[in-house]
Amino acid sequence: MPKDSGPLVPLHWLGFGYAALVASGGIIGYAKAGSVPSLAAGLLFGGLAGLGSYQLSQDPKNIWLFLVTSGTLAGIMGMRFYNSRKFMPAGLIAGASLLMVVKLGISALSKPHQ
């Protein structure tokens, strides 16, 4: 019987993709609309998500920075999506952030506590 090698895609790789999505969203917002706040927020939250993913790759139990970053972004962009009803960019980032929060929660709860 083969040994379970864990999840199909390690969580930190999903996290790096999420961080790239957030950062590129800020860059695109700046390029299309000249929005400096969008650029700053995208790079800040993308950088924090990237750092959180790196921490996760070093220690799978160290989820807090990534969880707080994606949870905060889910809340902020969720409110923007609720008020604007525009999927791009608020709905996309809110949805991706919520999925990351759920994935982190499932991952944290499914690991045996030591």
UniProtKB/Swiss-Prot annotation:
Protein name, as recorded: Transmembrane protein 14C
Transmembrane segments: 8-28, 33-53, 62-82, 87-107
Subcellular location: Mitochondrion membrane
Record bears the keyword Cell membrane: no
Biological-process GO terms, alphabetical: heme biosynthetic process; regulation of heme biosynthetic process
Span of the signal peptide: none
The entry's keywords: Heme biosynthesis, Membrane, Mitochondrion, Transmembrane, Transmembrane helix
Gene3D superfamilies xref list: Transmembrane protein 14-like
Function of the molecule: Required for normal heme biosynthesis.
Chief localisation class: mitochondrion
Organism encoding this protein: Bos taurus
GO cellular component: mitochondrial membrane
Similarity-based family: Belongs to the TMEM14 family.
Topology of the protein relative to the lipid bilayer: Multi-pass membrane protein
Record has Signal as a keyword: no
